[in-house]
Amino acid sequence: MSVIRRLAAVLRQSDSGISAFLVTAPRKYKVYKIPKRTTGFRVIAQPAKGLKDIQRAFVQLYNFPVHDASMAYMKGKGIRDNAAAHAGNQYLLKADLEDFFNSITPAIFWRCIEMSSALTPQFEPQDKFFIEKILFWQPIKHRKTKLILSVGAPSSPVISNFCMYEFDNRIHAACNKLEITYTRYADDLTFSCNIPNVLKAVPSTIEALLKDLFGSELRLNHSKTVFSSKAHNRHVTGVTINNEETLSLGRDRKRFIKHLINQYKYGLLDNEDKAYLTGLLAFASHIEPGFITRMNEKYSLELMGRLRGQR
């Protein structure tokens, strides 16, 4: 059955209606920018509601393989699991893929379909046109530019994880031979081990594999390649691994949370800051529950419960 027919059945629309809608789908995005944590902006391209519905239906209809080393956008996994995988190792390497989502094109997607070593959906030639319209965004509406994966589409996390499957599979196998632990959280690659100097050769291995699989489309962001060890603070996707091999919020974040709780205690936070603090406390409870226990003891269960919206 064709992709259009399956989507039409699930969405209770006509084949012709969906086909006509998809012709201009890559231009049906609202674009805005949000500041990055350090410098610059991240471009978010959010699809129109009708296109979102089609994208969600597509990734529910077709099961794309995702490697076990992938920690982002997966039910039951998250940044805590990503950091915990490396907690018992002394030496750490962090690497970053440059402009990750926007570097994934239809050509990469189809190449990954062809070369996947896992069970992967197969499509009829006539489906190709519409699948590209469903999944990819055209950044400049009035000029014929190449299609790319957008940050903001509900299908993009699934497709990005799938497109990295073969990379994850091969780098994981290579790491296993060297007793290196490997995980990937979206564009963040993390490697760790207990053998000195083994990680030094990993960046060149990553680059060679990226070139082999994706040509020059996916690249390392060399400014974000960081080596660290137990002698220094080790941070993995925002989580600190301390020398006792347990996960921590880190000293600075704890100090900041305590400051905000104190501000709240004396009525000095506005509603926006309260909501932000509530989110920080939920994160803290997930990463380091003992810290929340200590805050309950210091500031009282009543105040902390009120802050978290429990009463």
Swiss-Prot record:
Positions that bind Mg(2+): D96, D187, D188
GO biological process, one term: defense response to virus
One Gene Ontology term of the molecular function aspect: RNA-directed DNA polymerase activity
Presence of keyword Transferase: yes
InterPro entries linked: DNA/RNA_pol_sf, GrpII_Intron_Splice-Mob/Def, Reverse_transcriptase_msDNA, RT_dom
Entry EC no(s): 2.7.7.49
Keywords from the named record: Antiviral defense, Magnesium, Metal-binding, Nucleotidyltransferase, RNA-binding, RNA-directed DNA polymerase, Transferase
Domain of life: Bacteria
Family: Belongs to the bacterial reverse transcriptase family.
Known function: Reverse transcriptase (RT) component of antiviral defense system retron Ec78, composed of a non-coding RNA (ncRNA), this reverse transcriptase (RT), a probable ATPase and a putative HNH endonuclease. Expression of retron Ec78 confers protection against bacteriophage T5. At multiplicity of infection (MOI) of 0.02 cultures slow growth when infected with T5 but do not collapse, at MOI 2 cultures enter growth stasis. Responsible for synthesis of msDNA-Ec78 (a linear ssDNA with a 5'-terminal phosphate residue). Unlike most known msDNAs the mature product does not have an RNA component.
Protein name: Retron Ec78 reverse transcriptase
